[in-house]
């Protein structure tokens, strides 16, 4: 009999209420010779244009209200001390609020209030550009990242990268302990220690929090691997702040990652490394992380169907992903009920054990 497949999350519109990264600040500034955009990105299947207008990066629908040309192949221009986003087709110019302020073909005519493009919340934090498509609930924050602004720490903001999988599977990959022995033997883990204890998982202020102490007796791990005691703070829906107290010198090493849903088939991934007491050049840290990602990617992209299925069998050591899936399901259902229900689902604490 053919297996009956059913996705866990049938309605993912709730994700529009969260902040998602769409590019690094460096990627934005490299996208156009001006350094101000425009730049086209896609978030949750929606084409967006980014542009720096009057010193602030804005996000808007990447479609001119006139004849639907993509504004991301237009230009940023200035007039009378103000910046505008100009359509490449007929030169319509939009301000930072998305309103059309000039129609060159009809310069003396009044402009219809319909001549506007949808604009969205957009902020720069951690040298990353963040967008929120729906602010009607206004109860979500840009995810947590520890020590980014600490002057005693060294920071690497890596270029983003695309995987052909959904953001849920990418998040689960990063927080899954059981795969280390099989996907990363000799890189991150000693296969002799394939089993591990279950952990306490807490919901705290919109985060999943848990800890893990890998076996210190592991052998064959390369010296560049950041091994130590792991503390996770994972802001919903897809961010992971992994703080490691390194065994070699008790210094702190933070590996932060976020998966951003491009569409229903792919996600754009972001990585920041924050470290202290480290004289190694940035490229060595990036090379090691690329080695780990290259081991993970073919396995994660092999998972099908792409969406998480209700029929997937879980065991005790899948506790983190089980709690993650449960919370996403609750968020999906609560968003339909309205702002208060969604806010309660995001912020209600569920404590298994005091940290």
Curated annotation (Swiss-Prot):
How would you summarize the temperature dependence of activity?
A: Optimum temperature is 30 degrees Celsius.
> What's its catalytic activity?
theobromine + NADH + O2 + H(+) = 7-methylxanthine + formaldehyde + NAD(+) + H2O; theobromine + NADPH + O2 + H(+) = 7-methylxanthine + formaldehyde + NADP(+) + H2O; 3-methylxanthine + NADH + O2 + H(+) = xanthine + formaldehyde + NAD(+) + H2O; 3-methylxanthine + NADPH + O2 + H(+) = xanthine + formaldehyde + NADP(+) + H2O
Residue numbers binding [2Fe-2S] cluster:
64, 66, 87, 90
Enzyme Commission numbers on file: 1.14.13.179
How is the co-factor bound, per the entry?
Answer: Binds 1 [2Fe-2S] cluster per subunit.
Q: What GO biological process terms does the UniProt entry carry, in alphabetical order?
A: alkaloid catabolic process
Which keywords accompany this UniProt record? 2Fe-2S, Alkaloid metabolism, Iron, Iron-sulfur, Metal-binding, NAD, Oxidoreductase
**Which terms in the Gene Ontology molecular function aspect does this entry carry?**
2 iron, 2 sulfur cluster binding; demethylase activity; metal ion binding; oxidoreductase activity
Q: How does activity depend on pH?
A: Optimum pH is 7.5.
EC top class, in one word?
oxidoreductase
Domain named Rieske is located at 19-131
What this protein needs as a cofactor is: [2Fe-2S] cluster
The cross-references to InterPro entries, in alphabetical order and at most eight, read: Cholesterol_7-desaturase, Rieske_2Fe-2S, Rieske_2Fe-2S_sf, VanA_C_cat
Q: PANTHER family from the xrefs? A: 3-KETOSTEROID-9-ALPHA-MONOOXYGENASE, OXYGENASE COMPONENT, IRON-SULFUR DOMAIN CONTAINING PROTEIN
Function, in words: Involved in the caffeine degradation, which is the essential first step for assimilating the carbon and nitrogen in caffeine. Catalyzes the N3-demethylation of theobromine to produce 7-methylxanthine and formaldehyde. Also catalyzes the N3-demethylation of 3-methylxanthine, caffeine, and theophylline to xanthine, paraxanthine, and 1-methylxanthine, respectively. NADH is the preferred substrate.
Task: State what protein this is by name.
Answer: Methylxanthine N3-demethylase NdmB
Q: Which organism is it from?
A: Pseudomonas putida (Arthrobacter siderocapsulatus)
């Amino acid at each position: 009999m053919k297996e009956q497949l059913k996705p866990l999350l049938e309605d993912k519109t709730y994700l529009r209420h969260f902040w998602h990264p769409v590019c690094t600040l460096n990627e934005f500034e490299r996208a156009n010779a001006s350094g101000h955009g425009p730049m086209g990105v896609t978030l949750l299947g929606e084409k967006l244009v980014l542009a720096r207008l009057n010193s602030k990066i804005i996000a808007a629908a990447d479609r001119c209200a006139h004849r639907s040309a993509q504004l991301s192949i237009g230009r940023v221009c200035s007039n009378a001390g103000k910046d505008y986003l100009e359509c490449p087709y007929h030169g319509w110019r939009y301000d930072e609020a998305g309103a059309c302020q000039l129609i060159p073909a009809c310069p003396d005519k009044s402009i219809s209030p319909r001549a506007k493009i949808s604009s969205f919340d957009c902020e720069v934090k951690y040298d990353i550009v963040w967008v929120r498509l729906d602010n009607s609930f206004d109860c979500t924050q840009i995810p947590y990242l520890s020590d980014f602004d600490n002057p005693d720490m060294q920071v690497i903001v890596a270029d983003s990268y695309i995987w052909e999988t959904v953001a849920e599977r990418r998040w689960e990959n990063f927080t899954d302990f059981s795969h280390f022995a099989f996907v990363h033997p000799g890189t991150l883990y000693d296969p002799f220690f394939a089993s591990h204890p279950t952990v306490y998982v807490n919901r705290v202020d919109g985060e999943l929090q848990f800890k893990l102490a890998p076996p210190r007796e592991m052998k064959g791990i390369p010296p560049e691997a950041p091994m130590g005691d792991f503390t996770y703070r994972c802001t919903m829906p897809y961010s992971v702040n992994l703080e490691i107290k390194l065994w070699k010198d008790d210094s702190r090493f933070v590996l932060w990652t976020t998966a951003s849903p491009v569409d229903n088939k792919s996600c754009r991934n972001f990585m920041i490394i924050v470290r202290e007491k480290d004289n190694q050049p940035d490229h060595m840290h990036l090379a090691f992380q690329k080695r780990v990602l290259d081991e993970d990617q073919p396995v994660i992209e092999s998972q099908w169907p792409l969406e998480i299925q209700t029929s997937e069998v879980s065991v005790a050591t899948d506790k983190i992903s089980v709690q993650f899936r449960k919370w996403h399901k609750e968020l999906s259902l609560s968003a339909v009920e309205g702002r208060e229900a969604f806010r309660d689902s995001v912020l209600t604490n569920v404590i298994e054990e005091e940290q």
